[in-house]
Amino acid sequence: TGGKSYTCTECGKGFIKKSRLVTHMKIHTGETHFICTECGKGFSQKGILQTHMKTHTGEKPFTCTECGKNFAQITTLLRHLTIHTGEKPFSCTECGKHFAHKGHLVSHMKTHTGEKPFTCTECGKHFAQKGHLVSHMKTHTGEKPFTCTECGKNFAQKTNLLCHLKIHTGEKPFTCTECGDKFAKKNNLLRHLKIHTGEKPFTCTECGKAFTLKGSLVGHMKIHTGEKPFSCTQCGKNFTQKNSLLCHLTMHTGEKPFTCTECGKGFALKGNLVLHTKIHTGEKPFSCTQCGKNFAQKNSLLRHLKIHTREKPFTYSECGKKYSQIVNLASHMKIH
């Protein structure tokens, strides 16, 4: 097709020259004639070995004219340039999604075919991409070759290290177009966007409650199972979720690492600081659909809604009196 008369019988890739097909076949056979003298890693092609050697020498001769970033390989530079141009020339014929790199399209296509040709020899788990298998294997070996130069923390994957580094640099390159919130990771932005869309694709099979995030559903399911795997070493109290344990631990340590830049007030939890800052900004993003009243916090809106629904879930066991808010119940209890 298109003048490529030599086709690989393994994957269907076409080549103009027979010699290139022969070289390509070594990928499938695993043949490695070219060995790195530094680390012993084997390669099927001399050119790939030469490129690999730059990881040891630190040589990065290819520079981006847009931002000045240096690269060891010209192909890596060309891929990087699409960040600046926004070019996405590779389209999925199934769903129309566009990609900057052909490799990303090939990987994406496996989501439609369900193909997972790479298998872990330790546990039998299957993967669509070889890179995912390589990363997964480190869970068995415990290997963490990527070290943060700032704090010394080790990571199994380079991408995890790069994400971690943003904690030190404060870099948040991903911005929500709806509200302007910034995020260090693209996945965090995608999760956040579901707040605006109201999308809740994860449903509890026990009670039907829907969740925006899979992790939230997993945490919720423990309510039904009664599972509380996270224990406080200080007092022995058990928790369903790790985050709940971490929040609880601040009671023992008294730690308040999150400080308001406006008034200096300290908070044990980042979420509480975020809510507090709305006092200074006057932001009230949560609106009552019944009367239009606005609130700074979602919990305040939920409490307010009980006025309209006349819901009174808090009952005093001594006299049977009901209240819509727990603070009102607490005030009443002082009378008795």
Curated annotation (Swiss-Prot):
InterPro entries: Znf_C2H2_sf, Znf_C2H2_type
Mapped zinc finger ranges (C2H2-type): 6-28, 34-56, 62-84, 90-112, 118-140, 146-168, 174-196, 202-224, 230-252, 258-280, 286-308
Localization per record: Nucleus
Residue intervals passing through the bilayer: none
Gene Ontology terms describing biological process: negative regulation of transcription by RNA polymerase II; regulation of cytokine production; regulation of immune system process
Keyword Magnesium: no
Function: May be involved in transcriptional regulation.
Family of this protein: Belongs to the krueppel C2H2-type zinc-finger protein family.
The name this protein goes by in its record: Gastrula zinc finger protein XlCGF57.1
Lineage: Eukaryota, Metazoa, Chordata, Craniata, Vertebrata
